[in-house]
Amino acid sequence: MTQAEIKLCSLLLQEHFGEIVEKIGVHLIRTGSQPLRVIAHDTGTSLDQVKKALCVLVQHNLVSYQVHKRGVVEYEAQCSRVLRMLRYPRYIYTTKTLYSDTGELIVEELLLNGKLTMSAVVKKVADRLTETMEDGKTMDYAEVSNTFVRLADTHFVQRCPSVPTTENSDPGPPPPAPTLVINEKDMYLVPKLSLIGKGKRRRSSDEDAAGEPKAKRPKYTTDNKEPIPDDGIYWQANLDRFHQHFRDQAIVSAVANRMDQTSSEIVRTMLRMSEITTSSSAPFTQPLSSNEIFRSLPVGYNISKQVLDQYLTLLADDPLEFVGKSGDSGGGMYVINLHKALASLATATLESVVQERFGSRCARIFRLVLQKKHIEQKQVEDFAMIPAKEAKDMLYKMLSENFMSLQEIPKTPDHAPSRTFYLYTVNILSAARMLLHRCYKSIANLIERRQFETKENKRLLEKSQRVEAIIASMQATGAEEAQLQEIEEMITAPERQQLETLKRNVNKLDASEIQVDETIFLLESYIECTMKRQ
């Protein structure tokens, strides 16, 4: 765990949960697993506050616990899960594009609350959607339930581990902490609920839009004496499935940039066909026949079977080897080499960074060293057609920034410089780790800058919010245009200009955070898949 990662975790925890939770979370990240009383003693926080902070962290899967032999429960921070909070806006936006506003709000509620039952999610989302609708219109629970089922079917949401029923019925003393288990086949099984009702607006707390008293409208079809059918069945967002989707999108974009739109659509179809059957850590997708791919192409995509076969052959023969041929049955069996695709994307990211930092000539040398694996300085000058002095400077720049490494191969045991080969090489894994570390630093700097900008203009922001609230309440009571204009003039022209500048700066910083996180995702995925292969 590097200092840059710890600092970023600290900023994220403070921004999402406040100072006390941040203090406990960072302490656990620094020290490793610890029991409750040791955490309270070391952080100088009251036992009650530590318990509440740990409750929040466990609820959001940021801390896990384990019961040791002597019955001591130790808590351990999940740093990688804390860093995933950076990606929350991306998870929510992805769901919006795939499942519209309803899907977006379902995932948003699960991310905001950590874990929720399906019935609670459906009710919250229906209420929120009803708030945004015109008067007289409401969102039906059944419609939200259908979207939830679709999210579960495509594995974007999953059940949380729960306490097994045998443990509850045990007559002996309860364990210090429950052991949570999940059955693989039940992970995406949606409970059969008959949710009847519609979303409510906040202002109509006594009666709903239809005028029926709130107490008389049944929430569920089950008798009130019976427990809610999904009581104890909690759901969470499946972040690994989102990461699989992001990876697939990156591969499709890379194929589109390298070849054309038709090739990318074929690859997208192959990925879509195997997205549920292929695990997120698998090196290859499931083999698919040419005939299956042809039948699964999007409706209205008019290409013949012969043209499809030609495209598949081109993709299989491409030097990047994103697509590989695994057999000849069914018109040819094809797979997507996910590990090679991630390696190519990580290499392209490194090349892009070298070009931006050091210029096109350095990028040329970098690509040459990548291609040749090991190369001497004299050979770099000859192959890259760059003068000796410039080539030496550029190689030293990249060497000092850890984009390259130097390997010594002595001719004699004494390692005399005159009798030693000095070969430049690129270790993609170590370069990716170095760049990932810098990305964490960049994100932390962006968050700090955004917080500074907001703090500097705190008074002005509060004034703007007050004015907006007054205008909204006056509009609701049917105030005249002149009155509204008078309230708006409470913010002067220079203040309005300052607000616009602040908004523009914060939007730029937010966009930069998301862009840097895209690079982080590619590098993390590449490092993870490489480590698994080793």
Curated annotation (Swiss-Prot):
Keyword DNA-binding on entry: yes
Keyword Nuclease: no
GO cellular component, one term: nucleoplasm
Name of this protein: DNA-directed RNA polymerase III subunit RPC3
Subcellular location: Nucleus
Modification type Phosphoserine: residues: S194
Gene: POLR3C
More about this protein: Antibodies against POLR3C have been found in the sera of patients with systemic sclerosis (SSc).
Biased composition regions of type Basic and acidic residues, renumbered to the chain: 211-228
